[in-house]
């Protein structure tokens, strides 16, 4: 391990750099720097040599050219163990640079701003930074390269232990981190620019680069024989399972995360009052609105108490102690997630130490559109996320729905969007009465919804029915009418719409078309 004698520091994120540079200076390391970083370090009382002085060449083109010079890259790429490299460096007056501390212009943060222009984005594409990082990382046998402030302490501790050197194993690990960082950076640029054409913004680029960071190594995947890990998007900001803070409980499993995502995204649909969603195997088994969270939970649980066992529970408001106690006293639960959790509720749930309690923060009323991905063998299906709900509802039956039926229809319709297809949801008074999920025939989903309601002791008479897609035959309507359903909401669009509408009229049911399908596979 050679002693570090010279370090080049140039940063956008200057977190912790003054303290880091001060300790480097304590080992006699000469510090080279540029622009704002150099000023910050000088203002802190450190001796800094400008890169332009080191190279004998001025910064130019509004700072676009600062470090793109042989005296920088020769000092980084020259192999200290190669006599020819050493001789060439000496011949041209190139001094070795043993450490690079660089992070990049904030391109992703810049383009995350809805007001970002193409010019703004272009000016935040870093050129010199990635070039230095790659040069230093390539020659990691001789150069320490630091791209993450979280590594400052590790580097300093090694220098302290060795008298000013960094182990080659550490240099290699840091170099790998650099290539991961620059790949993500270039991927973000490629994705953003690739979706822009001369005519504006295209939805899909010709190529896409997905960049996720590992957040958790898991014991196993969907099943115990499968290995797994959880990766999160680098710039995700909206309240989600990916950004949630775990307050207590065991580590989240692969299935926990998938089910919690389903529950949270479903409960986000409801803003008219306190709401609760209970999910099992990614399907809502109970959804309800109440005067408060406790009532919402009680009603959601009542839909299907058996399926709620071992489920995931999501709320759209702060979890209070009374609701937390009702859950813990009544059922086994894997995960509870809410925008916030009261201190008293945390204390209540603490008695059940294995319950995973998550706090996700408040979400916007209108979530930003995002892309949805599904892996297939050898490919990737990409679509925009199904966030929309039909703005225009069309009554196609002779009978108009009552005001309460219309409220219940829209409630059930929102739930159906989160039930695996074929999806049927029975609802009444802001509560699911029965849920039929994942059947190959729609009429069987309707039958299951009725069976669920009967099994839970819930009255179907006067309830409404929502279907995620059209009814291909009238049998689903006949079946619903037989158990007491009085109104139906569905997309419409079947070749047999006329027969289906006629069936509704025969039974005196109201029927509403949305014109929008919500398959979920």
Swiss-Prot record:
It comes from the Bacteria. SUPFAM superfamilies: Cytidine deaminase-like, Methylglyoxal synthase-like. One of its GO terms (molecular function) is phosphoribosylaminoimidazolecarboxamide formyltransferase activity. PROSITE patterns: MGS (PS51855). Keywords: Hydrolase, Multifunctional enzyme, Purine biosynthesis, Transferase. Pfam families: AICARFT_IMPCHas, MGS. Its EC number is 2.1.2.3, 3.5.4.10. Pathway: Purine metabolism; IMP biosynthesis via de novo pathway; 5-formamido-1-(5-phospho-D-ribosyl)imidazole-4-carboxamide from 5-amino-1-(5-phospho-D-ribosyl)imidazole-4-carboxamide (10-formyl THF route): step 1/1; Purine metabolism; IMP biosynthesis via de novo pathway; IMP from 5-formamido-1-(5-phospho-D-ribosyl)imidazole-4-carboxamide: step 1/1. The keyword Translocase does not apply. InterPro entries: AICAR_Tfase_dup_dom_sf, Cytidine_deaminase-like, MGS-like_dom, MGS-like_dom_sf, PurH-like. GO terms for biological process: 'de novo' IMP biosynthetic process. Residues 1-147 form the MGS-like domain. It catalyses: (6R)-10-formyltetrahydrofolate + 5-amino-1-(5-phospho-beta-D-ribosyl)imidazole-4-carboxamide = 5-formamido-1-(5-phospho-D-ribosyl)imidazole-4-carboxamide + (6S)-5,6,7,8-tetrahydrofolate; IMP + H2O = 5-formamido-1-(5-phospho-D-ribosyl)imidazole-4-carboxamide. Gene3D superfamilies: 3.40.140.20, Methylglyoxal synthase-like domain. GO terms for cellular component: cytosol. The keyword Metal-binding does not apply. NCBIfam families: PRK00881.1, purH. The IMP cyclohydrolase activity resides in the N-terminal region. Belongs to the PurH family. This is Bifunctional purine biosynthesis protein PurH. It comes from Geobacter metallireducens (strain ATCC 53774 / DSM 7210 / GS-15).
